[in-house]
């Protein structure tokens, strides 16, 4: 039996096409993936992300524990509510998961991890917490709704209470705040502004309906994937996994090398990889007809005249740009052009930074 989120019946009311997503019944779309995509780029859309896993880490050693567990450094978080993104690595510097961590107090951090990795994440966190004075608490009674797009904040404000709106007024990107029963965060997975709202399951249907009544368009997994790929955001299991280190996944910016005496899990292996040099994750753009897809081979000739090969990790048709885009893992000697093998022939592509669309506009 697949898991169902508390919003399952609301999806059916909106004629969602449901699919299995890592053991969860989730909406693929509500009729038109393209319309849902454009709604987020041009207006406001919302996603049920209640399948994500919310984990609270509390106790006197919470900061010290997370400084060991994560490649990014939670000690950088000085203002309550501030969040950071980063990887949780194994001893070989492979990525167990990518996650967001919110600093709420010196003894209370909230971590949001992926659904597909829930069981291994919880087991790893529990194992690594031994010897630290921390309590790790999963919060399955909390649902989550992401409201994204240029008009998302205004439409959400019409749903929030006056006290909630006052609590989050002027909140900067990558912050989260408890406002009444809602934990409201300025985070997302689309490259647009908006909120990710953690809500008690008992209130989730009412919040979803209130947002619907404000004209926020429900969006499924299909649009979520094209939006995150346009924004150059990794999808765990496609763009990186335990066989990939963060330097080869465009996550170098999330590694806190300083202070040098912080011995986070995977650090020694990661330093060796950094010194030896790794593959890198790049963006590809193909303006000809056709769609770049996961696992297609990528070829280029390096400066020494040697042919090199990489592979597409994520690819799609970009509704915003009107042509195909992809992320590919390639040797770091790549230049600004390459070829992708499609239907037994090679097609020229441009190589760009893996960030295609931000705030509705071309980003490269």
Swiss-Prot record:
EC number(s) on file: 2.1.2.10
SUPFAM superfamilies cross-referenced by the UniProt entry: Aminomethyltransferase beta-barrel domain (SSF101790), Folate-binding domain (SSF103025)
NADP in keyword set: no
GO CC field: cytosol; glycine cleavage complex
Subunit structure: The glycine cleavage system is composed of four proteins: P, T, L and H.
Gene3D superfamilies on file: Aminomethyltransferase beta-barrel domains, Aminomethyltransferase fragment, Probable tRNA modification gtpase trme, domain 1
GO MF, one example: aminomethyltransferase activity
Record-given protein name: Aminomethyltransferase
Keyword flag Aminoacyl-tRNA synthetase: no
Protein family per UniProt: Belongs to the GcvT family.
Keywords: Aminotransferase, Transferase
GO biological process, alphabetically ordered: glycine decarboxylation via glycine cleavage system
Stated role: The glycine cleavage system catalyzes the degradation of glycine.
Cited Pfam families: GCV_T (PF01571), GCV_T_C (PF08669)
Database matches in PANTHER family: AMINOMETHYLTRANSFERASE (PTHR43757), AMINOMETHYLTRANSFERASE, MITOCHONDRIAL (PTHR43757:SF2)
Catalytic activity: N(6)-[(R)-S(8)-aminomethyldihydrolipoyl]-L-lysyl-[protein] + (6S)-5,6,7,8-tetrahydrofolate = N(6)-[(R)-dihydrolipoyl]-L-lysyl-[protein] + (6R)-5,10-methylene-5,6,7,8-tetrahydrofolate + NH4(+)
Enzyme class: transferase
């Amino acid at each position: 039996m697949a898991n169902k989120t508390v919003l399952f019946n609301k999806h059916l009311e909106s004629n969602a096409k449901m699919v299995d997503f890592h053991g969860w019944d989730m909406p693929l779309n509500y009729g038109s993936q393209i319309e849902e995509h454009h709604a987020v780029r041009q207006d406001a859309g919302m996603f049920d992300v209640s399948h994500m896993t919310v984990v609270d880490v509390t106790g006197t050693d919470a900061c010290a524990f997370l400084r060991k567990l994560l490649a990014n450094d939670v000690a950088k978080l000085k203002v309550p509510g501030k969040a950071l993104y980063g990887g949780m690595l194994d001893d070989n510097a492979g990525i167990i998961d990518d996650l967001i961590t919110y600093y709420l107090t010196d003894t209370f951090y909230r971590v949001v991890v992926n659904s597909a990795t829930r069981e291994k994440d919880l087991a790893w966190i529990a194992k690594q917490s031994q010897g630290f004075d921390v309590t790790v608490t999963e919060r399955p009674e909390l649902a989550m709704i992401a409201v994204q797009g240029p008009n998302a904040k205004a439409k959400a404000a019409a749903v929030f209470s006056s006290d909630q709106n006052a609590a989050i007024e002027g909140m900067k990107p990558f912050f989260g705040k408890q406002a009444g029963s809602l934990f409201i965060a300025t985070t997302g997975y689309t490259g647009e502004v908006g909120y990710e709202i953690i809500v008690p399951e008992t209130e989730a249907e009412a919040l979803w309906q209130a947002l619907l009544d404000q004209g926020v368009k429900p969006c499924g997994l299909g649009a979520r994937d094209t939006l995150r790929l346009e924004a150059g955001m990794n999808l765990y299991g496609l763009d990186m996994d335990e066989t990939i280190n963060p330097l080869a996944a465009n996550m170098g910016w999330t590694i806190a090398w300083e202070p040098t005496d912080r011995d986070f899990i995977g650090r020694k292996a990661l330093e060796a990889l950094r010194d030896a040099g790794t593959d890198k994750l790049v963006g590809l753009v193909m303006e000809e007809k056709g769609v770049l897809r996961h696992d297609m081979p990528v070829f280029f000739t390096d400066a020494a005249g040697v042919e090199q090969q990489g592979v597409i990790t994520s690819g799609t048709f970009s509704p915003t740009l009107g042509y195909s885009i992809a992320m590919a893992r390639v040797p770091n000697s790549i230049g600004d052009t390459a070829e992708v093998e499609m239907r037994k022939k090679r097609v020229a592509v441009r190589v760009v930074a893996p960030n295609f669309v931000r705030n509705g506009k071309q980003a490269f």
